[in-house]
Amino acid sequence: MSIGSHSFSPGGPNGIIRSQSFAGFSGLQERRSRCNSFIENSSALKKPQAKVKKMHNLGHKNSTTPKEPQPKRMEEVYRALKNGLDEYLEVHQTELDKLTAQLKDMRRNSRLGVLYDLDKQIKAVERYMRRLEFHISKVDELYEAYCIQRRLCDGASKMKQAFAMSPASKAARESLTEINRSYKEYTENMCTIEAELENLLGEFCIKMKGLAGFARLCPGDQYEIFMRYGRQRWKLKGKIEVNGKQSWDGEEMVFLPLIVGLISIKVTEVKGLATHILVGSVTCETKDLFAARPQVVAVDINDLGTIKLNLEITWYPFDVEDLTPSTANVSKASALQRRMSMYSQGTPETPTFKDHSFFSNLPDDVFENGTAATEKRPLSFTFGDLPYEDRVPPANPAEPSSAHVSSSPDITTAATQHRALKSSESSSPDCSSSDSCGDAVPEPKDLPSPGEAVVTGNKVTPRARSEVCQKPSNAGSDRVFIEANVPVSLLQDTDEGSELKPVELDTYEGNITKQLVKRLTSAEVPGTPERLPCEGSISGESEGYKSYLDGSIEEALQGLLLALEPHKEQYKEFQDLDQEVMHLDDILKVSTFSESTTLKDI
């Protein structure tokens, strides 16, 4: 920040005006260089703070375009803006590289929640960088159009001078009229482009750090500071307290940058109700404030430099007035979350998480399963194909509430356990051999199909065990029903199954949420032999499925709960999904305990 040309100091009662120079600095450039020595760049990147209210009564940006273009000033502001945007891009590219390296180091020995949070931070920085690049392209496009209009305007101006010096004639007058019309059009276009570029300058966040006056400031002194930037105003009052402390009625203000316009600062000492002594008034340049890092500025208020105004000025390349405000936490995670919420609009080619519902990214048959969208159906998740698995087909295929073990099992939560048990008992015939069923001819729908495990009460007949060993599964069936009559091989409880295991996901394949859903719907079952061993009992079959149960169902449910945790408070769909997943986990534990008890009874 540099100081303007005029500075005012009060005169004494004898009319003597204090000298305008100090230590040989009498010219404008010398005074500017003297004040530039107080500009310091912060060594660390300061994260965005919570915004304060703006001067809404002054209008958003400039409602009117300037009447006269300022091409030289426009070029200076464009160069400063371009350098600031490039610096912003470099800073965030460095931050992105650091986060990416951190993700590579943590992805092998971290849990899903840590990786998911780090992936969200990386995605937020990437979206912010894409918006910066899009912003830079818009600025360049506007400046190129401005240069074209400037050349046309210069050409029209030279032609107007040439026709004015030529002999007067009717054709010359007509040509001069046409040239004047074109010159006016080009001038208006330049003013319009200046106004459009002014809307892309972002905002200056000015934070009050207090006055520094050495022995000049005494306890009890009161000061008024008035800042004017175009049509924007900021007036604040402060008092010097004991032990060098200062209290001000305002600490932070947001100014919208202007192409033509300097910041004017006036400091007044309040002596009484109607006694105000002007300490000094300065004008500050703003083109040096387009920087990625906060700048601590010390402005000389008087000519001797005995009173300085300390300000911390931070430039944000985007105007975030109408976006979601953030909290005042300045930690790294909070800053990244704020940035993600602030810049969630994105560019046209950059869709964000808020623009798409979580359920719209899933296949249509995951939740609807081919039925109409308006039909109420139980929520289910499909795990991978289990090619050589025994199944228990339903005894009554016309009954929609019945379910069976298949090669693509679903965990269904709609039907209650007493209804399922009643359905299974009614569908199972009360005969275990052809001799006991010779007198009664059952209905075709009551006949058990091949490979069916006949269940009576809580006991499994030998016929069911023999057919389990003889008949391989058919890959056409696709349901598993978590009830008391499910084979123990799918629900055998082990000590290892109660432990949570980290889920390995590839961070280079896109959104982790999509990978998690893909993990739930993909075939990730370890290969099994072509035919299950027949010499063992049902408990022997459970060994082949123990790893599948431990590594797929429990792991997937816990991983899904971790993935839903950050978003279930914001989206109602996630709250319902979280409740369904917890219900699934409870049913799985109850069913596992029930089947373990049944196995002991057998």
Curated annotation (Swiss-Prot):
The membrane-spanning stretches of this chain are: none
UniProt record, GO biological process: cell adhesion; cell differentiation; cellular response to chemokine; chemotaxis; muscle organ development; negative regulation of cell adhesion; negative regulation of establishment of T cell polarity; negative regulation of protein localization to cell leading edge
| Bias kind Low complexity: ranges | 423-437
Arranged from A to Z, the UniProt key words for this protein are: Cell adhesion, Cell membrane, Cell projection, Chemotaxis, Coiled coil, Cytoplasm, Cytoskeleton, Differentiation, Hearing, Membrane, Myogenesis, Signal transduction inhibitor
Q: Where is the composition biased (Basic residues)?
A: 48-59
Q: Where is this region: Necessary for interaction with NCAM and myoblast protrusion formation?
A: 173-421
Coiled-coil stretches are 83-112
Query: Which segments show compositional bias classed as Polar residues?
Result: 403-416
Database matches in InterPro entries:
FAM65_N, RIPOR3
List GO terms (cellular component aspect).
apical plasma membrane; cytoplasm; cytoskeleton; filopodium; stereocilium; stereocilium membrane
Instruction: Tell me where on the tree of life, at the top rank, the source sits.
Output: Eukaryota
Q: Which GO terms describe its molecular function?
A: 14-3-3 protein binding
Q: Where in the cell is it found?
A: Cytoplasm; Cytoplasm, Cytoskeleton; Cell projection, Filopodium; Apical cell membrane
The segments labelled Disordered in the record are 46-73, 384-474
| Family statement drawn from the similarity comment of this UniProt entry | Belongs to the RIPOR family.
Role noted for this protein: Acts as an inhibitor of the small GTPase RHOA and plays several roles in the regulation of myoblast and hair cell differentiation, lymphocyte T proliferation and neutrophil polarization. Plays a role in fetal mononuclear myoblast differentiation by promoting filopodia and myotube formation. Maintains naive T lymphocytes in a quiescent state and prevents chemokine-induced T lymphocyte responses, such as cell adhesion, polarization and migration. Involved also in the regulation of neutrophil polarization, chemotaxis and adhesion.
Q: How does it assemble?
A: Homooligomer; homooligomerization is regulated by RHOC and leads to the formation of concatemers through the association of N- and C-termini. Interacts with NCAM.
Report what the protein is called.
Rho family-interacting cell polarization regulator 2
Source organism of this protein record? Gallus gallus
